[in-house]
Amino acid sequence: MSIASVASVFKGEHAVGSTVTVRGWVRTRRDSKAGISFLAVYDGSCFNPIQGVVPNSLENYDNEVLKLTAGCSVIVTGDIVESPGAGQAYELQVTAVEVTGWVEDPDTYPMAAKRHSIEHLRELAHLRPRTNIIGAVARVRNCLSQAIHRFYHENGFVWVSTPLITASDCEGAGEMFRVSTLDMENLPRTSDGKVDYDKDFFGKEAFLTVSGQLNGETYACALSKIYTFGPTFRAENSNTSRHLAEFWMVEPEVAFATLNDIAGLAEGMLKYAFNAVLTERMDDLQFFAQHVDKTVIERLQSFVSSDFAQVDYTDAVEILQKSGREFEFPVSWGIDLSSEHERYLAEEHFKAPVVVKNYPKDIKAFYMRLNEDGKTVAAMDVLAPGIGEIIGGSQREERLDVLDMRLEEMDLNKEDYWWYRDLRRYGTVPHAGFGLGFERLVSYVTGVSNIRDVIPFPRAPRTANF
C-alpha cells in the first residue's frame, strides 16, 4: 500500500490491482440500492475527482460512510481497477474509509453542490479553492509560475529578490502605499507643519514598491541576465476587473541588450509558458473551454504557433486612423493606446501577437532610452489577441546626461536616484528589460476575465479581507 495523489492514479503511475491510499475531500456521495456507495474524492492534484466504490460490508458503512457529505475530509484505501464507466480510466474498489473531518452543518456549508456565482465566491475567498473553477485557476497559475522560472533558469538568468519596501517611485506616478510606524494620532511635525519622517522607522518616507525594475537593473549591470518575480503594489483607486492593489510581476533585465533583444525574449518566454500549460494542464483547460471561454485552447495553440508582428507606434497610429473604425477614444499621435486600440491591432489588423515600439517620450517613464529623433523612447508593448497589452518594456537610458535631463523634465529629484545614476557613472552599459503582470497572464490563459479571480486573496479598494 502507498499514499497516492489522484493525479498519479489517473496517469497510470500505479499498477492496476495495486492498493493505494488517497487523501482528500468528498465532492459527492451517491448510494445505490445494491448496498454500494460511490464517493467522488478530490485532492486538488488534478481537475477530476476519483471515484471510490464503497461496499456496505465496511464496518463503518452505516454510521459514517452513509453520513458523508460534500466537504468532508477522508482517507480512502482501495485497489485500483479499470473503470467500467465513461469519463475516467481508473477507480478504487474501497477497502477502508477513515473520516478525518466532518462538515458540521451540511445545510449551511457554502461550498455544497449548488453553483455559486464567481462574484459571490470572492466573498468566500477562504473556501473558494474548493470549487472547480478556482482550483483549476490555482493549478494553472502554479504551472505558469514554474514554467517561467524554468525558462529563465534554462536561459542562464539569475533570480534576484528585490525589496518590497522602497524609497523610490519607479514609475514616477506617485500612486504608492506609504509604510510607516509613526503614531497616526500624534504625528511629529517639522517647523513648517509637514510630517517629520526623520522620526519614522527608516528616517525617511518609505513605500511599498511599484516595481522591482530599478533594483533589478543594479544586478543586471553585474550579473548580465537577471529576473525578478514577486509582489508589487499600486495605490490606484480603480475598482475595475483589470486592476489590483497587490499583484505579481515578472521583470527580466539584460545587460548589453537592445529593445529588439527583449522583444525576442518576451516572445520566447510567453510561448514557453503557454506550451507548458497546454502540455501539463489540459484537464483544467478543457474545463475552462467548456464553462468559461470556449476559445482558450485554440487561442493558446494559435499564440504559440504565430510569429509576433512588430510595428512602430507612429505606424500603429496611422493604421488605427485609416481603419474606418469609430473608436470610443479618438486616435492621434501622442496618446497612450487604449485597450480598444490594442485589441484592434492584435485581433483585426495583424491577427497575431504584436509588438508596438518607440512610443512618444511624454507618455513613458524617465528611465526609457531617448531615441535619436528626440520625440520617442525605445519602449515596447506586447499586445495579445483577446486581451491587449500583456507586457511592457524598454531599453533603459544608459547615458547619465540624458537620464538627468529626463528626470528634470518629469520634475523628479535626481538626488533621490543617486544610486541609480551611479550605474551610469561606473561602467555604464546598454541594457533592457520588461515587466509582465502575472495575473493578467493567468487571466489570458484561463479566460477568467476578472483579475480578482486569478489571485488567491485579491487586494483592491475597500477589499482586504482574509
Curated annotation (Swiss-Prot):
An annotated GO cellular component = cytoplasm
Per the UniProt entry, the Enzyme Commission number(s) are: 6.1.1.22
* Reaction catalysis annotation: tRNA(Asn) + L-asparagine + ATP = L-asparaginyl-tRNA(Asn) + AMP + diphosphate + H(+)
Q: Which top-rank group of organisms is this from?
A: Bacteria
Annotated Gene Ontology MF terms?
A: asparagine-tRNA ligase activity; ATP binding; nucleic acid binding
Q: Where in the cell is it found?
A: Cytoplasm
Name the top EC class.
Answer: ligase
Q: List keywords of the entry alphabetically.
A: Aminoacyl-tRNA synthetase, ATP-binding, Cytoplasm, Ligase, Nucleotide-binding, Protein biosynthesis
GO BP annotation list: asparaginyl-tRNA aminoacylation
Per its UniProt record, what Pfam families does this chain match? tRNA-synt_2, tRNA_anti-codon
Q: What is its main location?
A: cytoplasm
InterPro entries reported for this sequence? Aa-tRNA-synt_II (IPR004364), aa-tRNA-synth_II (IPR006195), aa-tRNA-synth_II/BPL/LPL (IPR045864), Asn-tRNA-ligase (IPR004522), Asp/Asn-tRNA-synth_IIb (IPR002312), NA-bd_OB-fold (IPR012340), NA-bd_OB_tRNA (IPR004365)
The record's note on quaternary structure and interaction partners says: Homodimer.
**HAMAP family for the chain:** Asn_tRNA_synth (MF_00534)
Family membership noted in the UniProt record: Belongs to the class-II aminoacyl-tRNA synthetase family.
The name this protein goes by in its record: Asparagine--tRNA ligase
